[in-house]
Amino acid sequence: MDYRMCWLEYRGLPADVAGKLKDWFSSVSILEPGSSVLKDEIRRFSERSIGITPRFYSRPLKKEKYIMVGRLESLPIKLDVNLGEEGFMLRTIEWNGSKILLVTGETKKALVYGIFDLMKRIRLGEDIEKMNVLAKPKAKFRMLNHWDNLDGTIERGYAGNSIFFKDNRIIINQRTKDYARLLASIGINGVVINNVNVKKREVYLIDSIYLKKLKKLADIFREYGIKIYLSINFASPVYLGGLDTADPLDERVARWWREKARGIYDYIPDFGGFLVKADSEFNPGPHMFGRTHAEGANMLARALAPFGGVVIWRAFVYNCLQDWRDYKTDRAKAAYDNFKPLDGQFDDNVIIQIKYGPMDFQVREPVNPLFGGMEKTNQILELQITQEYTGQQIHLCFLGTLWKEILEFDTFAKGEGSYVKRIVDGTLFDRENNGFAGVSNVGDSVNWTGHDLAQANLYAFGRLAWNPDEEIERIVEEWIKLTFGDDEKVLENVSYMLMKSHRTYEKYTTPFGLGWMVNPGHHYGPNPEGYEYSKWGTYHRANWEAIGVDRTSRGTGYTLQYHSPWKEIYDDINTCPEDLLLFFHRVRYDHRLKSGKTLLQTMYDLHFEGVEEVEEFIKKWEELKDRVSPDIFERVKERLHMQLEHAKEWRDVINTYFYRRTGIPDEKGRKIYP
């Protein structure tokens, strides 16, 4: 095997712990037909962590201690619990003269989740004799979006090539199954396997030439409770069907999609549905035919509805041909302006997928006002696990801290307590089909994610999607212990690095919600005016005196899309959170912040501080040289040194840019290039 298994590397447990577990794992009763996945995982854990090979039975046992795995309905013990479709229970009980650790749920996938959770808890030191866990996911949809292309490349991928595709073929191998294991262990239940930008070759993924292989892929993922989805091109009836239109209100088009859906479900009965990027960045959509997003999405949804499928429709729609001289058009307003008027017009099996912020996964953005703005529409929160604008898995940038802030944001849509996490789990507006989507950071590299520590982003996404109330510090501790073991120094140093890393990255790149000071196209490295005169609506409009776009009620009016009190808070430069100051306001460089320092001096200071913090990360990592495996140590060390050099470049380019703009030097006399 030429890759590691991230947090599922089952290492040997301490001898005293393994000794206590041997009695439990020597005999396992699995009351579930077709339970090879359950047996395989238990066997793998037992052999590697405990040092024994368990014997499996399909009946209750007469034994002092053992594990029993089965659906609630198949247990010889009657339990009055409501677990739902995906919830599970781990409970140690005494029954019929035996001590039994029960792993139970109402479905097979619940048992899979339960087994992975049991292994995790044992590895984290919990006592099997006192196990009492009842866990249910908060959100129905917990998905990964792969931006993988059939040729094997990955759009915005920084961890090698696709694990799904190569040379226009679908790949199925041992790594496919291991990926399903990784995802099931963190509660992911859906995977979109191809890029939302569906090119001419990818259009054929819904055709019979690929469906036979897709069926095999779906069969593997199904065993782990995961449905597969496909991104589609809205104009497929033209490209594939030979029609002269893709108008969603044309009956020929609707019929074509109904027949195509039937063909897919003939191969994959539990196919999840379609992800659609329409009328966005030159992708075709219903606007081409004078139709609304609701009309386009509903037509597709009705083709899938008889089979239980859903349409996930991205809200990433804006004018991508803006003239930089146009001061009235504001890209930040686009998603709300396009979709808010359609609230309540989408079918029940349509879900609008909304990026966390109104722009495009910048280092920091405000929460998208569509969260709280659409009460009658299913919504999925889209987060970007892959680090397109946050260091591309060369820089250490743990995103879990940012995601937690987003989830805890109170929209005030129904008064105080209207948190984003309550919107995406469906409870605030009583919506069933809500959830999470994360743009995957996975490729075929040895560590799956390019940077070994970027695995923490994938792990944190899954854990937060399962339970957005989980403390991020706990998630970080779990990942470190599962990945590196129980070394306290490793836990201390890596936790420090992860928890600080996003703020550090923000400091030496674009603080204050500035954004977009990157090189066009590939989005790596500093370029203060790389997008300043482009068609993409990505402007900061810096001159010698001030910087930032006025998005207040006196400017573009973006602040008016929020509920009170946020519209008033963001509208006032004195109450606007400073970490978003330049997103909402045009600010003079001599404006005094709460610290008493000017905006410009703070900008200088932050960029120097950010570099110093990366130097600190390197020292922290060097202290772990003999405490983590040599290959991981060297890979992370190499990336941290690359990060340091690139952070210095960011510091010098951005500070020089502002110095040359303003002529105002750094008060502390540090090196800035005139």
UniProtKB/Swiss-Prot annotation:
A GO BP annotation: glucuronoxylan catabolic process
Reported pH dependence: Optimum pH is 6.3 with more than 50% activity occurring between pH 5.2 and 7.9.
Hydrolase recorded as keyword: yes
Site (Participates in a stacking interactions with the sugar rings of 4-O-MeGlcA): W147, W536
Amino acids binding beta-D-glucuronate: N197
GO CC list: extracellular region
Entry keyword set: Carbohydrate metabolism, Glycosidase, Hydrolase, Polysaccharide degradation, Xylan degradation
GO terms of molecular function: alpha-glucuronidase activity; xylan alpha-1,2-glucuronosidase activity
InterPro entries referenced in this protein's UniProt entry, alphabetically: A-glucoronidase_C_sf, Glyco_hydro_67_aGlcAse, Glyco_hydro_67_aGlcAse_N, Glyco_hydro_67_C, Glyco_hydro_67_cat, Glycoside_hydrolase_SF, Hex-like_dom2
Residues binding substrate, per UniProt: E155, R156, K277, R314, R331, K355, E382, E506, W536
Catalytic activity: Hydrolysis of (1->2)-alpha-D-(4-O-methyl)glucuronosyl links in the main chain of hardwood xylans
Signal peptide: none
Residues annotated as catalytic: E281, D360, E388
Top EC group: hydrolase
Entry annotated with the keyword Mitochondrion: no
Pfam families the record matches: Glyco_hydro_67C (PF07477), Glyco_hydro_67M (PF07488), Glyco_hydro_67N (PF03648)
Its EC number(s): 3.2.1.131
Activity as a function of temperature: Optimum temperature is 85 degrees Celsius.
Assembly and interaction partners: Homodimer.
Family, similarity comment: Belongs to the glycosyl hydrolase 67 family.
Job description of the protein: Alpha-glucuronidase involved in the hydrolysis of xylan, a major structural heterogeneous polysaccharide found in plant biomass representing the second most abundant polysaccharide in the biosphere, after cellulose. It catalyzes the cleavage of alpha-(1->2)-glycosidic bond of the 4-O-methyl-D-glucuronic acid side chain of xylan and releases 4-O-methylglucuronic acid from xylan.
Protein name: Xylan alpha-(1->2)-glucuronosidase
Species the sequence originates in: Thermotoga maritima (strain ATCC 43589 / DSM 3109 / JCM 10099 / NBRC 100826 / MSB8)
Gene designation per UniProt: aguA
